[in-house]
Amino acid sequence: MLELDIQRATDAAAPDDAAFRRWCELALRQRTADSEMTIRLVDEAEGRELNHTYRHKDYATNVLSFPADVPDDLLDIPLLGDLVICVAVVEREAAEQGKSLEAHWAHLVMHGCLHLLGYDHIEDEEAEEMEGLERELLAELGHPDPYADDETDTITH
């Protein structure tokens, strides 16, 4: 079971809680243990500050993933980690890339969840595996391949 805390730190329009739950549960279905995670929706100022603090990049990015990195058996809390999503960046990217807003939201939430599970895209082989999973998950929701029209990785972090 997924315990999901959604923190809306911005008044900007964003998907409803049910959509976030659906996307997270789909991305996390390979994890058999209970999971607890937080999604914090932020404005560009907070997104920029967090990206600068944790990644030394002076701009707001679409999604930041903070895995808990705590073994499940160490605590009685199945803490998976946190996602921070900058609403304005998601909206801007969807428009610039000609993607539906819902598909882009789904992609970024599931991308972040995969990071919480330990997937990464630093090395080419890792990126291929992670992007393949993202394509499969999005296809299950009826969304197109997020990388089809892009020669480079659309995830900015």
Curated annotation (Swiss-Prot):
Write out the annotated subcellular location: Cytoplasm
Chain positions recorded as Zn(2+) binding sites? 111, 115, 121
Against Gene3D superfamilies, the record matches this protein to: Metalloproteases ('zincins'), catalytic domain
Task: Show the PANTHER family listed in the entry.
Answer: ENDORIBONUCLEASE YBEY, CHLOROPLASTIC (PTHR46986:SF1)
Obligatory cofactor(s): Zn(2+)
Q: Name one Pfam family in it.
A: YbeY
Q: What is this protein called?
A: Endoribonuclease YbeY
Q: What does this protein do?
A: Single strand-specific metallo-endoribonuclease involved in late-stage 70S ribosome quality control and in maturation of the 3' terminus of the 16S rRNA.
Q: Which gene encodes it?
A: ybeY
What are its GO cellular component terms?
Answer: cytoplasm
Primary location: cytoplasm
